[in-house]
Amino acid sequence: GSSGSSGSSGSSGSSGSSGSSGSSGSSGSSGSSGSSGSSGSSGSSGSSGSSGSSGSSGSSGSSGSSGSSGSSGSSGSSGSSGSSSSSSSNGSGSSSGSSQSSGSQGGSSSTSSSN
C-alpha cells in the first residue's frame, strides 16, 4: 500500500582527506511507494582510494521502506573502504538497513528500518 514513512540518513562525519568519494544512493522504489528519506550514505567520506559506499535501496512493489540504507560516518581509511548494503525487497514488504561496514571505518553505521 502507500506508506508515508520518512527517515533521514543520520550519521554523518567529516573527514578531510582527498580521494574519490563515491557514495551512490540509487533509491529506486517502484510501485505505489511513499517512502521518503535519503537512501545512500551521507557524510563526507574522504578516504583516499575507492570509497564505494553503495546503498542501492531497490524496493520494488508497494513498499514504504525508508531510513538510511548504507553506511556513513567518517571513513578515513586509505584503501578500498567498501561498505555495501544492498537492501532489496520484492513484493509488498518493506525492508531496509542491513548495513555491513567492512574495512576500517570509524563512523557510526545507522540501520534505520521503518515498516
Swiss-Prot record:
Tissue-wise expression: Produced exclusively in the middle (MSG) section of silk glands.
Cellular compartments per GO CC: extracellular region
Keywords carried by this UniProt record: Secreted, Silk protein
Chain spans, region Disordered: 1-115
Primary site of residence: secreted
Keyword Secreted: yes
Function: Provides the silk fibroin thread with a sticky coating. Acts as a cement by sticking silk threads together.
Protein name as catalogued: Sericin-1
Naturally occurring in which organism (per UniProt): Galleria mellonella (Greater wax moth)
Source lineage: Eukaryota, Metazoa, Ecdysozoa, Arthropoda, Hexapoda
